[in-house]
Amino acid sequence: MDKFTVHSGLVAPLDRENVDTDAIIPKQFLKSIKRTGFGPNLFDEWRYKDVGEPGMDNSKRPLNPDFVLNQPRYQGASILLARRNFGCGSSREHAPWALSQYGFRAVIAPSFADIFFNNCYKNGLLPVVLSEQQIDHLFNETNAFNGYKLTIDLDKQVVLTPSGQGYEFDIAPFRKYCMLNGFDDIGLTLRHADKIKSYEAERVAKMPWLNNRVVG
């Protein structure tokens, strides 16, 4: 996955509490065995006026002009500003996939559902927890100013506003290490590839019968 060090991006405000994973990526789009192609159906039931199904040409579907991601001022947003309990509901990993594939690098909220929170880290999407008061201030700023951008410095663990105000956030050291270096579970395992190969070779030498193929 991509490294996350410092990111500056346009903010899109999603002013709803308890946004669940079925709203983030509806269940009918979970049939694919691939991990790609979910971005166009992010918040599908809110972005479009019709009912979406896999295989539809989204470019021909009627958009909901009132939904935040369809408004011109938020096109190209890479930081999602949300309310409490974001990502509640089922544990589908497709939810952070859809957010990342749409173009979001981070979600800032006062609280997240636990499983969604963990899935974000495993897929390179940074979940940032700030206080309710700080979130309220950011919503006010984002709504008041076109082109409102934030900078997230993961190494320093701070969110910087255009005025230079900084909001510090917490992150577990191991998760921070993985995000800074772009390590998902597979990447962490591959760091030990030489040791794994050495162990496998040693095992074959000591217990060759384990490699015998049983037929019948």
UniProtKB/Swiss-Prot annotation:
InterPro entries: 3-IsopropMal_deHydase_ssu (IPR004431), Aconitase/3IPM_dehydase_swvl (IPR015928), AconitaseA/IPMdHydase_ssu_swvl (IPR000573), IPMI_Swivel (IPR033940), LeuD (IPR050075). It is an enzyme of class 4 (lyase). The keyword Transmembrane does not apply. Gene3D superfamilies: Aconitase, domain 4. SUPFAM superfamilies: LeuD/IlvD-like (SSF52016). Belongs to the LeuD family. LeuD type 1 subfamily. This is 3-isopropylmalate dehydratase small subunit. It comes from Cupriavidus pinatubonensis (strain JMP 134 / LMG 1197) (Cupriavidus necator (strain JMP 134)). The gene is leuD.
